[in-house]
UniProtKB/Swiss-Prot annotation:
The keyword Chloroplast does not apply. It comes from Mus musculus. This is FAST kinase domain-containing protein 2, mitochondrial. GO terms for biological process: apoptotic process; mitochondrial large ribosomal subunit assembly; mitochondrial translation; positive regulation of mitochondrial translation; regulation of mitochondrial mRNA stability; RNA processing. Ubiquitously expressed. Expression detected in spleen, testis, colon, heart, smooth muscle, kidney, brain, lung, liver, brown and white adipose tissue with highest expression in testis, heart and smooth muscle.
Length: 689
């Protein structure tokens, strides 16, 4: 056997292995090449909503497979080993055959003629040929159908009366109708759709047409089917995924956008994962050819967090290249896109932030929330962006619902940003309308204000009393955990409402908190409650809640600060490090000085230790996280610790570890000397770090 014959046989065998359901182009009567599907294994009696079986499990080999070609015939490429089949070069298949199907019949090739189709009756066991002919009815317009029908069942009724090709139009019409009705009605309509007698027939037709319809129609169908809530593990959905995977080389820029939109809303499974892998390969090849920013962002959102770093970098460079063409919507949407990719591109975020700041007025609630959530997920802190959003919400305060304002503040709290103007506005509203608050609102407001340590200059007492009164009215139906969260926040703000605390310290409530839910977090908050009741001015100093001991937290004082103190105080005998204190507190360093803070005493000096004019000084080396964003305003836990250390007789000095880290040793000694030997008052208002 010569080499050419061996090569031909090898090609035929490889082709049959790679393509168990072969795709070819047959010569149309008009002389054009159109694709036709040759099914090797297809059972039309299978129920189309059965769970996807093993026979259709995905395989990576279906991604980007090539068709083996041997010679050219009249503008097409003739393949050997496939009878009467002509195919184009495999970069894209054109002009799919338009056929008409009804719910009872299907068309397949009989394998003997290029132009004839055999009609098989699915509801009869006989395989006898009935007739052979070509039908070209006018396809239904899905937009017109969506206007004429008022429900999903109406669309299925229309289909059952006169089914036409393509079936995708019926699913598109149903999705358009579903989008314009309420969620409750949509849920009811979906149940009626599943039980409609024509639904299974439409699924059968959709599966039969998948191989021959236009690729973009196929993708639109998948998107509509997924959005309609048809289970992803059904045979129809998995068949569409498999077919899309096999035909992925037909994907152009428009198809990339549609496919990405569909995949974003789908749960991971074997076929989805294989299709997403194929999409990544395709995007990697075509990224520089993408012309529309919207398509680029849709693809980036679909790529996912686990995409290769090289692909993420390539998409980032493409986005930076297109930055000048970004619209306002593109800039707003870019935050969500980068969060979906887990790509913290500071350059892109900074440029898009400028656009958002300039156009924040009139920006919808969902867009602003999405931007803040993305900043949280990406750990991106832009004070100017946060200020512009907070000021916009504060100036338009009356147009927002209470729960929307609270949602903004919860996100600002997670970002460590304190917006005083907006928080003062909400405090005034709470004082004026305490009856409008429910339990969830009360707990959320208390959490934000205690965490950010915000105090109103005028209405602070009235604000706390209004919240306490509203909480007291909810005690009969509040959960133990919500009550603990509320009282914990009150204690952090040095306020002790009688009724809520009396309810919380009941034995059955304490036992419930110690045995259910997040017990570790509950125990920590109860310890804070015990500490506040003992140290702060309250009527509950004699109350003690028996609790398990908290685990000792390993704390290593800053070594550079230890060396600075050793040089400054001329030896380690004049300070003590990592000092444990009552109530689960500890301090990094303790220094003993006179009340004027001009002289340092040695720890070995017994007379100095008992002197009445001695002042204990607590030196704490703190990170930026204990302050609100870009300020020296301490957050709630640090403010409470400072308050309690003062009660225990300490003067507190805070050393910023990020400032100390930048200084040389000589400069660091000078920096700490000014902190220790001065009467500097700890900041309680905003100052720039």
């Amino acid at each position: 056997m010569n080499s050419k014959a061996r090569s031909l046989l090898w090609t035929i065998r490889r082709f049959s292995t790679l393509l168990p359901r072969s795709r070819a182009l047959r010569i149309d009567p008009l002389g054009t090449c159109r694709p036709e599907v040759i099914h090797s294994k297809w059972n039309p009696r299978n129920h189309r909503l059965n769970v996807f079986d093993e026979g259709l499990q995905p395989s990576v080999r279906y991604l980007f497979q090539d068709i083996f070609i041997s010679k050219s015939v009249d503008g097409c490429i003739q393949t050997k080993g496939i009878s009467h089949s002509a195919v184009f070069k495999p970069d894209r298949l054109l002009c799919p055959r338009r056929l008409s199907f009804d719910a009872k019949h299907s068309f397949v090739s009989d394998g003997t003629s290029d132009h004839d189709l055999k009609k098989i009756n699915f509801h009869h066991t006989s395989s006898e040929d009935v007739f052979t002919k070509k039908v070209r009815p006018t396809p239904v317009n899905y937009k017109k159908l969506a206007q004429e029908c008022n429900s999903l069942s109406d669309v299925l009724d229309t289909f059952s009366k006169a089914p036409t090709f393509p079936g995708s139009n019926y699913f598109l019409a149903m999705w358009i109708i579903a989008k314009r009705i309420s969620e409750d009605k949509r849920r009811f309509e979906r149940q009626l759709m599943f039980s409609h007698p024509a639904f299974n027939q439409l699924c059968e037709q959709m599966m039969r047409e998948a191989k021959i319809m236009h690729y973009d129609h196929l993708l639109f169908s998948l998107n509509a089917i997924v959005k309609l809530g048809i289970p992803q593990n059904t045979l129809m959905v998995q068949t569409l995924l498999r077919t899309i995977q096999e035909r992925i080389n037909e994907c152009d820029e428009r198809c990339l956008s549609i496919l990405s939109t569909a995949l974003v809303s789908m749960e991971p499974c074997m076929n989805v994962n294989a299709l997403r892998a194929g999409l990544r390969i395709l995007v990697d090849q075509q990224v520089w050819n993408i012309k529309h920013v919207f398509t680029l962002q849709t693809v980036m959102k679909c790529i996912g967090k686990d995409a290769p770093s090289a692909l993420k970098k390539k998409l980032e460079m493409k986005a930076l290249k297109e930055l000048g063409r970004f619209s306002i919507l593109n800039s707003q949407h870019m935050f969500e896109v980068l969060a979906a990719m887990d790509l913290r591109s500071v350059v892109l975020l900074n440029e898009c932030s400028k656009v958002v700041i300039d156009n924040v007025h009139g920006c919808p609630f969902k867009v602003l929330i999405s931007i803040l959530q993305s900043c949280r997920d990406l750990r991106y802190q832009n004070e100017d962006l946060f200020k512009s959003i907070a000021e916009y919400v504060a100036t338009t305060f009356d147009i927002w619902k209470l729960k929307q304002v609270i949602f903004f503040l919860l996100l600002f709290e997670t970002l460590g940003f304190r917006p005083p103007g907006l928080m003062d506005k909400l405090m005034e509203k709470v004082v004026q309308e305490p009856g409008s608050l429910n339990v969830k609102n009360i707990v959320s407001i208390l959490h934000v204000y205690s965490s950010l340590n915000h105090v109103h200059k005028i209405h602070n007492r009235e604000f706390l009393e209004a919240l306490a009164s509203a909480l007291t009215g909810c005690l009969h139906h509040i959960s133990s955990e919500s009550l603990l969260n509320a009282v914990h926040s009150f204690c952090m703000m040095n306020y002790f409402p009688l009724a809520p605390i009396n309810q919380l310290i009941k034995e059955n409530i304490i036992n419930e908190l110690l045995t259910s839910g997040d017990t570790e977090k509950n125990i920590h908050k109860l310890h804070v409650l015990n500490t506040c009741l003992k140290l702060d001015e309250s009527t509950y100093k004699s109350v003690h809640i028996p609790l398990p001991q908290l685990p000792l937290s390993a704390s290593q004082p800053n070594e550079k600060l230890a060396e600075v103190l050793s040089r400054l105080l001329e030896g380690e005998g004049r300070f003590s490090r990592n000092v444990p204190l009552p109530h689960n507190y500890h301090i990094d360093f303790e220094i003993r000085m006179d009340t004027n803070r001009t002289q340092v005493f040695s720890f070995s000096d017994v007379d100095a230790s008992s002197a009445t004019n001695m002042q204990r000084v607590a030196v704490l080396c703190v990170p930026k996280s204990v302050y609100c964003l870009n300020s020296c305003h301490p957050r709630g836990l640090m403010a409470m610790k400072i308050r309690h250390l003062n009660v225990m007789g300490f003067h507190v000095i805070l050393i910023h570890n990020w400032e100390l880290k930048k200084l040389k040793m000589e400069d660091a000694v000078t920096f700490v000397r000014k902190k220790i030997y001065s009467d500097e008052v700890l900041p309680t208002a905003d100052t720039t770090v």
